[in-house]
Amino acid sequence: MRVDGRISGARKMRIVQAKRAGLKTLTMLGIVLLLTGCAGVNLNPLEWFNSDEEVNPPKELVDISAEIRLDRLWSVDVGNGQGDNYTEITPAIAGRVIFAASENGTVLAVNLDSGDVLWRNRLDERLIPGGVGAGGGLVIVGSRDAEVIALDQSTGETVWIGQVTSEVVAQPIANEDIVVVQTVDDKVTALDNVSGEQRWIYESTQPPLTLRGTSRPVFTPADTVVAGFSNGTLVSVSADDGVWRWEERVAVPEGRYDIDRVIDIDGDLVLDGNRIFASSYQGNLIALDVATGRIVWGLQDASSYHGITQGFGNLYYCSDESHVVAVRDESEDIVWRNEDLQHRSITAPTAISNYVAVADFEGYVHLISQIDGRIVGRSRVDDDGVRANLLADRGRLITFGNSGTLAAYSLQ
């Protein structure tokens, strides 16, 4: 067993539920020992407490008056999908092509309009733990062996293989100059776009216990890279050389035990002009000035390990209890909160047309009105569930189910 102090996805959800149920400190300490002693082992979360009884079971779905439906346009099988491990491999879009990968090393390119497979590359004996990146003419994935593999967007041929310090579970980002990856050991590394050689590395201080996952870094117009870390800080560094520009806390650790002090920034950041939005687990949702790091506004107790989306003048986030919340993007005012999907392990929200879309552990996609937060549409897209974030493209919704089915849907 590997001791690394990280909480994996299924365990992450179980921890949230256990904390919400108010379990005794002794029980929580036992969970910590389990996590730190067996990190990386694929366990069934329902067996944690040697009981068939679920802590905070997922809320049952109720009938809705559907105002919108999903019609499937095309679908493609992508290897073994999310595989047997708790991965969250999200595809990436560049131009009119979507790039997807499976946990067992299949990477492919699909025409967004027709669903035709343009190329397929099987990365032999490599397991992919995280999302796909696309930019600067490359498709980038990471391996469990701390490799970064860059493929040509047009052909799928391997351009280079770089080495980083740990596995990459967040989507890489890339431009014509560099590829930037964030690894689970809280390091951000820039690799040369052409050669794959390391250009710079930025390292943050990692707490004793963290959630397994990282947020995706973002490029800014100020020629910087902004990244969120497991110690609850948001950091801006120069894209040219990795030199520190500014740092600000999204959350402050509180509590006596390590598990109470987990404040990871795991969800993707949102860049909007001169502002950047971030949220943290057991922390806050904040808006900062991207040039200076100055906090513009903050919403306290907005615990989330998912990303944020934007639409209709609102920010949308999913809480650690799978509540979907709308907040004004100019202030911390809450517009609405939907608790109908409580504990259903929903994905990060995606804004599409007049709706916010999320998917859950049973494979249902829920369409929520951006205006009042009602669920107005529901379709099941994968019997094995959906963990990958949904994508929006020209009014169509792209899903990547756990079984490996990549599909595009129109809203009718």
Where are these regions (language model features)?
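Extracytoplasmic beta-rich repeat domains
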Residues: 41-46, 52, 67-92, 120-135, ...
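WD40 beta-propeller blade core
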Residues: 108, 149, 189, 235, ...
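Structural signature of WD-repeat beta-propellers
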Residues: 102, 143-144, 183-184, 229-230, ...
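Bacterial N-terminal signal peptides that target proteins for export
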Residues: 4-27
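Short loop/turn segments that connect beta-strands within beta-propeller blades
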Residues: 111-114, 152-155, 192-195, 239-241, ...
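Loop/turn-rich, solvent-exposed surfaces of beta-rich toroidal or solenoidal domains
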Residues: 314-326, 333-367
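C-terminal motif of bacterial Sec signal peptides marking the signal peptidase cleavage site
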Residues: 35-37
